[in-house]
Amino acid sequence: MFLRTVRSQAVRAAALHHTVAPALCMRPVLRTQTVAFSSTPVTLGKKKKGGKEPKAAAKAAAEEAVDEDLFMIEWNKFEDLSAKSVAAFAAKAKEIKAGNNSPDLINNIEVKISKDEVYQIKDIASVALKGGRTLSISVYDPSHTKQVTASILASDLNMNPQPQANSPQILNIPLPPPSAESRAEQQKELKALYNAFKADKKLTSGLAAIRDAFKKDHKKMADQKSIGKDVVKREDKKFEELQKAWTSKIEKEFKTVSDEIAKK
């Protein structure tokens, strides 16, 4: 509309050329406006082939970021559960390494204090392994020392607690050194535990069960049509890397404890 008006003005100016003084009809304003406006359509407006409009590209990037955040939530859960699994394996592996030297062997022995009072040793005393060859029991109430001693002797553990000379309420139990047979049995038990945590899907606290559950969830998310293929490909690779990392960690724990048993 503006171009049409300018053009009309230019036409009228040309018509007045013969009747108006030369100085007035030579003013450049109308000609400049006409040229500047008419050049605008030539310089604007061609979109590159195969390109995306800025708004469309921004929307696609935002959607991709949301998809990646969804996967990130899943991976955080996976790492948390995997860390707990490796910690559980490490704790059980240490129990196997301790063998008959473990304080847990006597912690649950029941002690009858009186007719109506029965406690477990862990409730009335602290038990610790000292020097690798001695279990030390510190009874909280000195009057309970005799009952604790009697309960340990009555158990089937073949242990003989001895009161410490300068502190009668502290009982020491000397432990025999491990034999080649006991070491071999510990190694066998440790290997079975390691295989269960690594590959047994029935062990819910193991890496295999956790990995299997997340594989199913991952597939459900990847199958959603709303999630882009590029995102799925990247997340597939990341999941593989996480699995390898945690498998490597539990393997490292296994080797560490296995070496410690061999050197006992």
Swiss-Prot record:
Q: Name one GO molecular function term.
A: ribosomal large subunit binding
Q: Name one GO biological process term.
A: translation
Where is this chain's protein located in or outside the cell? Answer: Mitochondrion
Q: Which UniProt keywords apply?
A: Mitochondrion, Protein biosynthesis, Transit peptide
- Gene3D superfamilies the record matches: 3.30.1360.40, Ribosome-recycling factor
One of the record's GO cellular component terms: mitochondrion
Major localization class = mitochondrion
| Alphabetical list of InterPro entries matching this protein | Ribosome_recyc_fac, Ribosome_recyc_fac_dom, RRF_sf
Q: Which residues form a coiled coil?
A: none
* Family annotation (Pfam families): RRF
The record's similarity note reads: Belongs to the RRF family.
Q: What does this protein do?
A: Necessary for protein synthesis in mitochondria. Functions as a ribosome recycling factor in mitochondria.
Q: What name is this protein filed under?
A: Ribosome-recycling factor, mitochondrial
